[in-house]
Amino acid sequence: MEFINLLLLLLMGHFLGDFALQNGRMAREKCPGPNHSLPWGHWLTAHGAIHGLIVALLTGIPLLGLAEWLVHMLIDWGKCRNLYRLPVDQSLHLASKAIWALLALVVFAV
């Protein structure tokens, strides 16, 4: 598979995970705040796991899925802490997808 093809698949997976598979409750409650139905960390972990699963399925590399899970949670945690806004948040996510595509093709030779 070519880099651009894998990158496009990962980007589509990202938008699926961030917009189609993340409901309003998860989007609100993955950040610390009052009146949550579950502790915020549960929501953030679940959201990161969705993204990790998508990356693992698309690349066939569970280790990249685990890396995505952790990196996605850290990026979203930074946004929750108001370290940056949505454009920076999404740019960091997109950059991570480029890194996963490169690693999949160069290191893991998918």
Please give the residue ranges for each predicted region.
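Mid-chain, well-packed structural core segment of small domains
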Residues: 56-81
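Helix-coil boundary and interhelical linker segments in multi-pass alpha-helical membrane proteins
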Residues: 1-8, 52-64, 99-110
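Interhelical loop and helix-boundary elements at the membrane-water interface
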Residues: 10-51, 73-104
